[in-house]
Amino acid sequence: MNSNDPTAWFTRGTESYLKKEYSAAIADFAEAIRLNPDYAEAYRARAIAYEQENRLADAVADYSAMLLVQPDNPTAYYSRGNCYFSLGRYDAAIADHTVAIEFDPSDSLAHVHRGNAYRAKGDRHRALADYNQAILLDQNDALAYRQRATLYQEIGEVEKASADFRVAERVAQRAFPTEG
């Protein structure tokens, strides 16, 4: 391996990651970044490895560094938003998912995750609006139906919750059929 080649370090880090050797992957991605501080993909890969080790603050830092290199990357906003959510930083999660949605308004998952952050903050109206939008965008999004069902359950709309849980189950069965 050429020790001065950031791509070689990135490749080795990817191989370590695939073997679930996350600490080794993190070290290799760090070396790739040291050799090329603008290596956006290495920041993303290291952030994902940090997530596997539940080092979410480190993952947030790497997604932020990636955004300095690629400010128009909706995936970085989406992923950082998910980390913020897991850290309980709901306003930051909402902000990042909003940016991701601005880049790609048809991203149903970004709507679901922003809805989750709104729900965690107690803003059920905005959460419901996001879940509804996710379902409008992708009627095969079982997660959106489950999240909306859970919200309906929380607000005492039992019939709507039951209906959404049934739809989520049907959608999931179509997506992942079982042998019978």
Predicted feature residues:
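Alpha-helical tetratricopeptide repeat
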Residues: 1-180
